[in-house]
Amino acid sequence: MTTVWEQRKLGDLIDICSGRDYKHLEDGDIPVYGTGGYMLSVSEALSENDDAIGIGRKGTIDKPYILKAPFWTVDTLFYCIPRDCNDLNFVFDIFQNISWKSMDESTGVPSLSKTAISKVEVLAPKSEEQGKIGQYFKEFDHLITLHQRKCDELQNLKKFMLQNMFV
């Protein structure tokens, strides 16, 4: 991997879309997401085929996550679809390393705007290298998750043993 990385605006890498109200929709199989994650399922999708990155517009603005299509997002959550050949996992890694709270545009409830997201300056390589880097970090995140589960299980076992040691 020796290609030159270019400084670009995040808005050049993604399309930023707004969530919408879901209350007029019937129950179904399409997951609805808000800033806190999964909420319920409805009958229609805002994004049928394109996976995206969810980022809070209001409330929790510093916890991006990947949305697998099809999905619906509420109006407090933007969904960002990588443009052209930009890699979803690579762009997600960028999102995870941005100090979103420092871009809060409110005096009350934390808020982000499409403009604030679009203007963020990032370094990005060509799409082939993005794909390799994105896949590497996806696998790394998976390993972290597996080890975290194991750690949680061991902590629960320790707690159980300590509670029952003197019974």
What positions do the PLM features span?
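Feature detects amphipathic, helix-rich regulatory segments
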Residues: 1-167
